[in-house]
Amino acid sequence: MKVRVRLAPSPTGTLHLGTARTALFNWLFAKKEGGTFLLRIEDTDIERSREEYINDIYDGLKWLGINWDESPTIQSERVNEHKQIIKTLVDKGFAYKCYASEAELDEMRETQKRNGLAPKYDNRHRNLTPEQESEFIKLGRDPVIRFKISDEKLISWNDLIRGKMTWSGKDLGGDMVIARRAPGNSIGDPLYNLVVVADDSAMKISHVIRGEDHLANTAKQILLYEALDLNIPVFAHTPLILNSEGKKLSKRDGVTSISEFKKMGYTSEAMANYMTLLGWSVPEGINERFNISEVSEIFSFKKVNKASAKFDWDKLNWLNSQVIHEMSAETLLENLEPLFKENGWHLPSHEWGINLVGLIGPSMVLINDGVDQAKPFFEEQELSDDGKKQLEIKEAAVILKFILEKLADSDAASFSKEKALDLIDQATKSCKVKKGVVMKSLRAALFGTLNGPDLIQSWVLLSRFSKDRARISRLI
């Protein structure tokens, strides 16, 4: 069987973490099997679909390294084909017009609720006579079109993740609506389950890989495949992604879209790595820190868990820090320089920038951390409480005055690590203090705090701007 899989997002919002994980599993499976990964934009919700969301989906997938193999299919462009299929189902007796009003349906559901029953359409208009239909038309009622689902029908399939699955027709909510209300003999807007079957068949999809929240839809869609005498694809239902409280991850949990993760400073490699781990167990001997192109060679649904996956911020942060620490200084600078420019910061030289990221990179978890850590090199910082306390000791002023006088006799462009160390030794001897006192006082004067990356390297970088002289002189 030629493997053809698809991602079918609805452009009613930005690319969600769960949708991106589904895309990743589809892509990995296609790569493993030498198949084709396709993209279909399900934009039939005209009121909520937006062009900006379509672009966000495209951009998010590309950023993650998930590229599709053929031009995207736009679902709304196939609406005439969808309506023709609905007409065929009606003509063959698999579907019918239902004239029940919304008020009648609400009353039906309320009655069922009072009797302790689950809401379910009671199929009241399944067998209307022509005379009954005429009466409803005279009343001005516009019908929906429903597909017949027998309560006695058992629907089974072999799920690649969950094994043998069986649903009973009586648990599917009664005859399902496949087209919205429309006047006369016209067919209303086709609905989800119908158009998915129509498009998956037209695209020759061999495997449908999606979240477990689609299990009931799969049962309904299999009935449509059978009625239309179409080949039924193989199904795989991935586990849900839960928040820390064990509830389905939603917008209420804060960041859920790929574009938001990107803005926060997460790397595409770490995101793809982490999303693969959300539901997939790493085979023995494989490190959890990997590249998705490597995983595509070993990916298997046998290692995808049935149980839901909990989102773990600590794990994602660890992976992101690993990716950053593995970056070359050139790559890290490429990521950071646009952020520096946004803040109005300009590098005195490329070499200076390379040295800066080499200094701050090891302590970064997010790309955006580089902005905070680089800020003291571009902008003078307010004194922290511990910095103020250090500069209030009587020796501090003497130390800083000595260092400033020595700096005045040196060339900023040639200031080096060796010269910095020598100057600290001179200050220690001349001021008759411990080296630690000199270094703490100097750090507080230069950076406003007693904490930070290596002081000597930091000082050498700052000296390229001659900012060390300016900052010390303001404190004396």
Swiss-Prot record:
Native organism: Prochlorococcus marinus (strain NATL1A)
HAMAP family noted in UniProt: Glu_tRNA_synth_type1
Top EC class for this record: ligase
Name of the gene this protein is made from: gltX
Assembly information from the UniProt record: Monomer.
A Gene Ontology molecular function term of the record: tRNA binding
Binding site residues for ATP: 251
InterPro entries registered for this protein in UniProt: aa-tRNA-synth_I_cd-bd, aa-tRNA-synth_I_codon-bd_sub2, aa-tRNA-synth_I_CS, aa_tRNA-synth_I_cd-bd_sf, Glu-tRNA-ligase_bac/mito, Glu-tRNA-synth_I_codon-bd_sub1, Glu/Gln-tRNA-synth, Glu/Gln-tRNA-synth_Ib_cat-dom
GO biological process, one term: glutamyl-tRNA aminoacylation
Keyword Isomerase among record annotations: no
Extent of motif 'KMSKS' region: 248-252
Stated family: Belongs to the class-I aminoacyl-tRNA synthetase family. Glutamate--tRNA ligase type 1 subfamily.
Family annotation (Pfam families): Anticodon_2, tRNA-synt_1c
The protein's Enzyme Commission number: 6.1.1.17
Renumbered ranges of motif 'HIGH' region: 9-19
Keyword check for Protein biosynthesis: yes
One of the record's GO cellular component terms: cytosol
Chemical reaction(s) catalysed: tRNA(Glu) + L-glutamate + ATP = L-glutamyl-tRNA(Glu) + AMP + diphosphate
Domain of life assignment: Bacteria
Compartments where located: Cytoplasm
Designated name of the protein: Glutamate--tRNA ligase
Described purpose of this protein according to its UniProt entry: Catalyzes the attachment of glutamate to tRNA(Glu) in a two-step reaction: glutamate is first activated by ATP to form Glu-AMP and then transferred to the acceptor end of tRNA(Glu).
Record keywords, A-Z: Aminoacyl-tRNA synthetase, ATP-binding, Cytoplasm, Ligase, Nucleotide-binding, Protein biosynthesis
